[in-house]
Amino acid sequence: MSSSRRSRQASSSSRISDDQITDLISKLRQSIPEIRQNRRSNTVSASKVLQETCNYIRNLNKEADDLSDRLTQLLESIDPNSPQAAVIRSLING
């Protein structure tokens, strides 16, 4: 079997159907608050859903970073041997 034929087969087997894409977009519509709050969320285009999903994920990452920074600052301000410090360390280290 030629290399290009194997590539085409691997590529086609990893593709998802239009129905699967539609289902995934629908699940994203239900998951993203900015879209879910829109009364006409079913009319929002797939590209808009993907754009809002990316924005939402970026915002979540920023919030997680901010919370981690705040926990680090809090940890620096308390007794490192206290039970609270142990809890904060467990939150920071996941």
From Swiss-Prot:
GO molecular function: DNA-binding transcription factor activity; protein dimerization activity
Alphabetized InterPro entries for the sequence: bHLH_dom (IPR011598), HLH_DNA-bd_sf (IPR036638), PRE (IPR044293)
Entry's induction text: Not induced by exogenous gibberellin.
A Gene Ontology term for the protein's cellular component: nucleus
Tissue expression as described in the entry: Expressed in roots, leaves, stems and flowers.
Localization: Nucleus
Annotated S-S bridges: none
Any further remark recorded for this protein: Plants over-expressing PRE2 show long hypocotyls, pale green and slightly narrow leaves, elongated petioles and early flowering. They are not sensitive to the gibberellin inhibitor paclobutrazol during seed germination.
Assembly mode: Interacts with HFR1.
Protein name (Swiss-Prot/TrEMBL): Transcription factor PRE2
Provenance organism: Arabidopsis thaliana (Mouse-ear cress)
Gene that produces this protein: PRE2
